[in-house]
Amino acid sequence: MAENMQASRPADDGWTTVIRPRSGWFDINLKELWQYRDLTLMFVKRNFTVLYKQTILGPAWILLNPLITTLIFNVVFGNMAGMPTDGVPGFLFYMAGNTVWTFFANCVNNTANTFVTNSQVFGKVYFPRLTMPVSQVLTSLINFLIQAAMYLLFWLYFFATGAEVRFTLWTLAVPLVMLQVMLLGLGVGIIVSSLTTKYRDLAIAVGFGVQLWMYASPVVYPLSMLDESPRLKVLVELNPMTAPIEVFRAATLGTGSVSAGAIVYSVAFTVAALVLGVVLFSRIEKTFMDTV
């Protein structure tokens, strides 16, 4: 059973820890979460150790995964399907979209099984349960920064060889946009994680669902390609990941279709998903040991 921890200091006995049941729909103690930041960082380290343990290439997969995926996109969608890339090198176009999408997908997939995979730990010792999903998105953030560095190296190569790519003022917004992507992934991930305590099918479906979600996002095609299909373009713009991907391309390639309305909608969706996720997480953590 999840509890809320508060500290008090009796006059003679020194510090003690008082654990009280949580109450309310939105009962998340951010101060307590910050106090356990060392534990969160320890979980981040554990995530890396578990993920690459007994692998031949180890952390090199952080770079190989998006690189191989980008090459496949370039061959299939660029060379074979002949999809436009808004006048920029196809390799950079696909890597830009894939870098942002991989960050989001990792945030969702890695937090989606928080309750199920950590049930034994949750049942033995008290700590803020939210440290688990937070550690997962921080792990994904580190992976993203490494992949973004690789993207920058390829960008410099193409720029040096005369490709028409450039950084724009949108670059200033990239840190905030990536924070939004991380929070959106956290929100969606903990929603799924909360529901999987009762509906295990979601744990299986989430990976497939994220893959389908990618094709509803402008990862392998430019949003401008849908100008002749207004209804389809509206549907794609309803995807909260459309704006972050387009902003990243606008920032680093000088292309992309970015509007203030799309950004506001994406941010609002992120806030709603995060609030809903935290509410569900707060409610489910009280009883999940009875269902997992």
List each model region and its residues.
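Hydrophobic transmembrane alpha-helices and immediately adjacent juxtamembrane helices
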Residues: M1-V292
